[in-house]
């Protein structure tokens, strides 16, 4: 069988770059395969994707050597339009992909360019939307849809092209756990029904394993470092060495010093149950200790907070909570549960009545958004909605300039924030040259220069690889130890388990759980009600059959924090 995608000793260097971004690339993908290309930010994986769909060299100029064939043809000699008949692409930034004013208009875009007659076009659009379960949304604006729905509409548009290859650029970046599972199931179904070749660019290895991948291609610093099956990749210990995260249960096995005797450790069900149970029980006996819980001062207190939108839709109902100085709190729940509504109420965008929001005991209900913004900072999920300046250093310095801070202090604080967020080498870059993940880190760096008391972060690690995830979260912990409080609005259960002191779960505008993350995320009824995902570590512990899996989870993450001095 001939490969449908073929790279042989391929190199590419961007027009103004000092050296090649990808070097000596050789791999083959065959028709009907499901392949993950994974690597940390800046590894070159997106460059490979752009070579496949024609954005290189037609949108991003540069020089290339070696061979590349897509469906037997050299894409460098074809137009982007011609390549789109072979490779359909779904971008990470879904909003940038929409063209039509309604869902059906957007799905029809390719057909309009092909001059398909209107009756046939309506039929194909309707069939494509039915295939992905979005036919009832055909008259809605794409921008009114949730992240998962936008992803699904984009896929419906690709199905109209009949392209044999589908290329996904970080398809799970902005989705909640339920939407992520839906997207993966949708891709699996499309593959099963139409035998499409699926290529996914991602650094979330664990989530993508649900796709039943044929192989994983790992790239680091522009070079291929491994091509193998998921089973062999996970058994090789290569992922941490190139800044990628292993599934949490495999990290747990290593921490427990579990000896697999060279048995296959993926999938989890292949493990020997009695061996796992014995190792966990032995570890728990050694690690049992009294948890030190120092008393902290209350920073934020919310009393009887309710909010309804103008259309009478209930956003929040009788919310009561406290946040303490230096505390890290994960705010969890499915899309539409009220997480963003609560955040907007705290910063003053939503005007609330008959409730009290207190900071250090002072009622701030009457405070303006600007005055609240001196104490409470909110970092949006989409970095493009926050960036206002043209270069990296100007963006990070902007708030300090407004406060008339001295030039010397601005330079020092801006550069320190950029170093922490891994952006110092790019300080003089134009912002449009940054990746999505780099823009995300830039918005966070901008906030850190202002020394707030409470920072609300909407999906703080979305679009970031594991290396920058760890680096950034270590910095957040240092800030928390200095007394700054954090609220994370997140769908990342691993983030909540590892870094949150407490997890608050919202469902239909009400708080349904408020406890340590290990207790909350080990409670099946809460997870199901809030559309949250069970961690693979908790699945491992349940699989072992031990009597108190929640206790293990609490001990496990307390032990990690103790080792890190938190």
Curated annotation (Swiss-Prot):
One of the record's GO cellular component terms: ATP-binding cassette (ABC) transporter complex
UniProt binding sites for ATP 2: 333-340
Entry membrane topology: Peripheral membrane protein
Location within or outside the cell: Cell membrane
UniProt protein name: Putative ABC transporter ATP-binding protein BT9727_2424
GO molecular-function terms, A-Z: ATP binding; ATP hydrolysis activity; ATPase-coupled transmembrane transporter activity
One of the Pfam families matching this protein, by short name: ABC_tran
Binding site for ATP 1: 39-46
Major localisation: membrane
EC number: 7.-.-.-
Enzyme class of the recorded protein, top EC level: translocase
Function, in words: Probably part of an ABC transporter complex. Responsible for energy coupling to the transport system.
Record's keyword annotation contains Acyltransferase: no
Family according to the record: Belongs to the ABC transporter superfamily.
PROSITE patterns with a match to the protein in the record: ABC_TRANSPORTER_1, ABC_TRANSPORTER_2
